A protein has these predicted regions:
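Beta-strand-turn-beta hairpins that frame and shape the catalytic cleft
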Residues: 8-12, 120-130, 210, 267-272
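Short amphipathic alpha-helices and their capping/turn segments at secondary-structure boundaries
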Residues: 24-31, 70-76, 115-124, 129, ...
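Active-site neighborhood of phospho(di)ester-bond hydrolases with catalytic His/Asp-centered motifs
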Residues: 14-16, 36-41, 83-88, 114-118, ...
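Binuclear metal-dependent phosphoesterase catalytic core
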Residues: 122, 225, 230, 234-253, ...
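Active-site-proximal loop/helix segment associated with metal-binding centers of metalloenzymes
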Residues: 129-212, 217-229
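Active-site environment of divalent metal-dependent phosphoester hydrolases
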Residues: 19-25, 43-47, 89-99, 120-122, ...
Length: 297
């Protein structure tokens, strides 16, 4: 993982699963990082209002929106660049088809904050590839998808207007409703993101740039806490086995993720995999002691 000749080291600060809906956070750039990576589950997008509505009707919902805006504005002030990917919680109580665009509009006044979804951002000689990733549900296992559909909030509280559902009422009338985001949708999104990473790193990989993948769901089973090691089905909603995929792409020097509320830092081939989640402040012990993590590539 040594630095190639002629490369300038870049300092990258890493955070995920800050869950500001449980409590605010002030991130300071004490290490002089060049880039802050926010690997998802930072806030609930439905609770973030447009900037021009911030000064009206300061009830609880408005207060929460003001807190979220304040956090992102401090990050954009304290760090030269902020790269942000949506986690699953960003989509809660929203429409999967429109939430990403809504989030971008609400934060458009911050020119150095980049929300990526199957997109890249090049900073100096580092290409950042961003997207939620989701999972392959244990390689599209039917039992895993059945359990995830009934057990995970993702598939109960996220709408998906791009997928209409036709149904018949008890009176025999045919109607259409908006579908819920489904495990099958998650697999589709996972495949798209994996293919995008493959295209970027394989087709553009001959250039001298280093690559960093910023995701939310884990790309490796190694990001599974020992206490959940035997929960094979449930783990399918948290991680995918992309170890070989990563090993075959040594140009990826760093891969960040969140989703699990346990810290991880390990190496697959030439790639450092880092997860630095805060979790639910006031509900999880590690959240009260959380610190920003800075690495160099």
């Amino acid at each position: 993982l040594g630095l190639a000749k002629g490369k300038i080291q870049m300092k990258i600060a890493i955070a995920s699963d800050l869950h500001l809906e449980f409590g605010d956070l002030d991130i300071q750039n004490t290490d002089g990082a060049d880039v802050l990576l926010l690997s998802g589950d930072i806030c609930v997008a439905a609770d973030l209002d447009m900037r021009d509505r911030r000064q009206t009707e300061m009830g609880f919902a408005r207060w929460r929106s003001e807190m979220f805006h304040g956090f992102f504005e401090r990050c954009a002030t304290n760090f030269p660049h902020v790269i942000y990917v949506m986690g699953n919680h960003e989509y809660y109580h929203s429409d999967f088809a429109t939430a990403l665009g809504d989030m971008r509009r609400k934060l458009a006044h911050l020119p150095n904050l980049y929300i990526l979804e199957r997109e890249i951002k090049v900073i100096d000689d580092v290409t950042f590839i961003g997207g939620t990733l989701w999972t392959d549900m244990n390689n599209q296992d039917d039992l895993t998808m059945y359990h995830m559909r009934t057990m995970m909030n993702d598939f109960r509280v996220i709408q998906h207007s791009a997928v209409p559902v036709n149904f018949r009422t008890s009176e025999g009338e045919f109607k259409t409703r908006v579908a819920k985001f489904s495990p099958e949708d998650a697999v589709t999104e996972h495949v798209k993101m994996k293919e995008y990473i493959q295209v970027v790193t394989d087709m553009l990989g001959k250039n001298p740039n280093r690559y960093v993948v910023v995701g939310h769901h884990s790309p490796s089973r190694r990001s599974t806490h020992a206490m959940y090691a035997n929960d094979t089905i449930m783990n399918g909603g948290y991680s995918s086995d992309l170890d070989e995929f990563i090993e075959n792409r040594p140009q990826i020097k760093l891969w960040t993720h969140g989703h699990t509320h346990h810290e991880f830092d390990y190496v697959i081939g030439e790639t450092r995999v880092v997860c630095n989640p805060r979790g639910y402040i006031g509900h999880e012990p590690q959240a009260d002691k959380w610190k920003l993590k800075t690495v160099e590539i």
